[in-house]
UniProtKB/Swiss-Prot annotation:
It catalyses: XMP + L-glutamine + ATP + H2O = GMP + L-glutamate + AMP + diphosphate + 2 H(+). GO terms for molecular function: ATP binding; GMP synthase activity. Its EC number is 6.3.5.2. Residues 218-410 form the GMPS ATP-PPase domain. Catalyzes the synthesis of GMP from XMP. This is GMP synthase [glutamine-hydrolyzing]. Homodimer. Residues 24-217 form the Glutamine amidotransferase type-1 domain.
């Protein structure tokens, strides 16, 4: 995606999106690695939230007119000469403000308090003691109680601004939570948004519901209705092309757009030959026969595999597949003719602006692996109906639209497909073996009732052969690696702790049913240090 087609995450766009009628909370990002979790926690309460970098916070605040503001954590120190700060307009507008970690420190300093470099740095789990009641703690924490939280800070507040009181303390933070009830300003040194703070979501709920007084009217049903109207307004009588992969994002986007404009939408499904077992047929049946969406199915497997012959480097595989996909998609789109818009399954994390402390915001936008660059090449405008949603919200929207659970709840699948689950050179033989082994593995997981407990599970065909004995004969066949992880966002992951009986029975079934495999291993690597995919 080129600069001219980069979507903006600025809150100033809110009046044009499907959220203008709803209460909103503005999240000012100071560079924390977990700022997105704040937005997700707020949205779990049915309140729409947007993230903006601190450099654009004042303009966003004035344009968005939020009902409350949250100041995120960040890596900087308020003691630095060029330390980022919140716009003072936020503190004079009469709206509730919640500061988290760095957000607490900048709030305290900007309002007249004192922050000092900590003599006792706190990173990781810590115990916090409640020394006074406040609205944030209502029904969650009691005075005198001690509770687990997650800390990550060096500086600390040592003198309160006028109007504030300390309501909790920790060993490294004598002033760990502060409250100004009259102005509805609250701040905490720990991170309530992470799962390592067990009661964190409840504290954020109290800020949203009890402090800000928001009722939560932002639902997937409301989003669906507003998105349909927005698509109709944007597209008018124009035609839309959507690159369909069969994944959750493109599937939900296609169904939502079709609901809005019907047969003005045409989907193009490119089968590059590296899909899972029966995946192509499943996608075609669902969209062409069940939803009656105009669909062009292109079997380009021979073209892709021919170009990939001899390619072993994983990055070279990705680039080759991406280049070929664009070529094939563009050729099919031109055959359709007359299309004005290109639909993408862009999600909110793809358009959030990252924060730079070295000269203004740097925008990190991940274009869809399939259609990046096509809007400009084909002179089309973008339709991105999911650009306000997180992944879990897309799944919820899919259920609202009636998409079968087998699609809505399916595990993430990489754009290059099985190519990066087959280290080394790709051949038809290897892909066939991998498809069958993967199908058996997933079937066993589903039969055990474990599929929904796992973030992602898949088989890998290792580029080695080992000696085995089957019957009375010596074998020399491939090794299959099994991978399954738990995660909340894919950024970090732990391997799933299957019991030995499950692994044993799954291994036996793969070896018995998949010709060309005589050994199965299980990957017990977490992320980090490993990645979820092998390539």
């Amino acid at each position: 995606m080129t600069a001219s087609s980069k979507p903006s995450a600025s809150a100033s766009d809110s009046s044009a999106d499907g959220t203008s009628a709803h209460d909103k909370i503005l999240i000012v990002d100071f560079g924390s690695q977990v700022t997105q979790l704040i937005a997700r926690r707020v949205r779990e309460e049915g309140v729409y939230s947007e993230i903006v970098p601190f450099q654009k916070a004042e303009a966003a605040f004035l344009a968005m007119k939020p009902k409350a503001v949250i100041l995120s954590g960040g890596p900087a120190s308020v003691l630095d000469r060029a330390a980022p700060a919140a716009p003072m307009a936020i503190f004079t507008a009469g709206v509730p403000v919640l500061g988290i970690c760095y957000g607490e420190q900048t709030m305290a300093q900007q309002l007249g308090g004192t922050v000092e470099a900590g003599h006792h740095r706190e990173f990781g789990r810590a115990a916090i003691e409640v020394i006074d009641a406040c609205a944030l703690f209502d029904g969650v924490w009691e005075k005198g109680g001690t509770y687990d939280v997650w800390m990550s800070h060096g500086d600390r507040v040592t003198k309160l601004p006028d109007g504030f009181r300390a309501v909790a303390k920790a060993p490294g933070s004598p002033i760990a939570v502060i409250a100004d009830d009259a102005r509805r300003f609250y701040a905490m040194q720990f991170h309530p948004e992470v799962v390592h703070t067990p009661d964190g979501a409840k504290l954020i709920r109290n800020f949203v519901r009890k402090v800000a007084g928001l009722t939560g009217d932002w639902t997937m049903r409301a989003f669906r209705e507003e998105a349909v109207e927005k698509i109709r307004t944007q597209v008018g009588k124009g035609r839309v092309i959507c690159g369909l992969s069969g994944g959750v994002d493109s599937s939900v986007a296609a169904i939502l757009i079709h609901e809005a404009i019907g047969d003005q939408l045409t989907c193009v499904f490119v089968d590059h030959g590296m899909l899972r077992k029966d995946e192509g047929k499943t996608v075609v049946d669902l969209f062409r026969h069940h939803y009656n969406i105009p669909l062009i199915h292109v079997d380009a497997s021979k073209k892709f595999l021919s170009e990939l012959a001899g390619v072993t480097d994983p990055e070279a595989k990705r680039k080759t597949i991406g280049r070929l996909f664009i070529d094939v998609f563009e050729a099919e789109a031109k055959k359709i003719g007359g299309a004005d818009f290109l639909a993408q399954g862009t999600l909110y994390p793809d358009v959030i602006e990252s924060v730079s402390f070295t000269g203004g915001p740097s925008v990190t936008i991940k274009s869809h692996h399939n259609v990046g660059g096509l809007p400009d090449r084909m002179n089309m405008k973008l339709v991105e109906p999911l650009r306000e949603l997180f992944k879990d919200e897309v799944r919820a929207l899919g259920r609202e639209l009636g998409l079968p659970e087998i699609f809505v709840g399916r595990h993430p699948f990489p754009g290059p497909g099985l190519a990066i689950r087959c280290p080394g050179e790709i051949t038809n033989e290897k892909l066939d073996i991998l498809r069958e082994a993967d199908a058996v593995y997933i079937d066993e997981i589903r039969k055990a009732g474990l599929y929904d407990n796992i973030w992602q599970a898949f088989a890998v065909l290792l580029p080695v052969k080992t000696v085995g004995v089957m019957g009375d004969s010596r074998t020399y066949d491939y090794v299959v690696g099994l991978r399954a992880v738990t995660s909340t966002d894919g950024m970090t992951a732990d391997f799933y702790p299957f019991d030995a009986q499950f692994l044993g029975s799954t291994s036996t079934r793969i070896i018995n049913e998949v010709k060309g495999v005589n050994r199965v291993v299980y990957d017990v690597t977490s992320k980090p240090p490993g990645t979820i995919e092998w390539e």
